[in-house]
Design a protein with these regions (language model features):
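Extracytoplasmic electron-transfer domains, predominantly the class I c-type cytochrome c fold
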Residues: 62-63, 70-127
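N-terminal secretory signal peptides that target proteins for export/translocation
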Residues: 1-9
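Electrostatic cytochrome c docking/interface patches
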Residues: 26-46
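Generic anion/oxyanion-binding catalytic loop in active/binding sites
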Residues: 32, 43, 57, 78, ...
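Short, solvent-exposed linear motifs at loop/edge-of-secondary-structure regions
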Residues: 58, 66-67
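The canonical Cys-X-X-Cys-His
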Residues: 43, 47-57, 120
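Bacterial N-terminal signal peptides
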Residues: 13-24
C-alpha cells in the first residue's frame, strides 16, 4: 500500500479510538466503585449474613424476595407499594411480611440491634 493509504487508515483508527474513549464514561465502562462509609460497610456485612439468601443487592430481579437495588431511591417499595422511606423499610425489616410471596419474610426486629438496623439502612441507601 502507498504511504497515503496507510495515513488514511491510521487517522480513521485514531478517530474511532477517540470516539470509544469519549463514549466510555457514558456507557458504564468507567463506572466508579462506590466507597462505603464505615456504617454502610457494617450494613453490607449484615446484609450478606442475613438478607442475600432471599434478596439481590445489585439488581431488582426477584430471588425469593424482591431485588433491592435502588430500594430507597424509588418512589415506592416493591410488593407493598408503600412509599420508599427509611421508616417503611425499617418497619418491614423489623416486622417482616407474612404475606410475602413465594415465602413470608421473617421479622428481624429481635435479631438486629438499633445500631445494626441503622447500619443496614445506611447500606440500603447505597444500592
Amino acid at each position: 500500500m502507498k504511504g497515503r493509504s496507510w495515513n488514511g487508515i491510521i487517522k480513521w483508527m485514531m478517530v474511532v479510538a477517540l470516539g470509544l474513549v469519549m463514549a466510555a464514561p457514558m456507557s458504564g465502562w468507567a463506572k466508579e466503585k462506590t466507597v462505603l462509609s464505615p456504617s454502610a460497610k457494617a450494613g453490607q456485612k449484615l446484609f450478606e449474613e442475613n438478607c442475600t439468601m432471599c434478596h439481590y443487592a445489585d439488581q431488582t430481579k426477584t430471588k425469593i424476595g424482591p431485588g433491592l437495588k435502588g430500594v430507597l431511591k424509588n418512589k415506592e417499595l416493591p410488593y407493598s407499594h408503600r412509599p420508599a422511606t427509611v421508616a417503611n423499610v425499617q418497619e418491614q425489616i423489623e416486622k417482616g411480611n407474612a404475606q410475602g410471596k413465594p415465602m413470608p419474610m421473617p421479622p428481624f426486629g429481635g435479631k438486629l440491634s438499633a445500631k445494626d438496623m441503622s447500619n443496614l439502612i445506611d447500606y440500603l441507601k447505597t444500592l
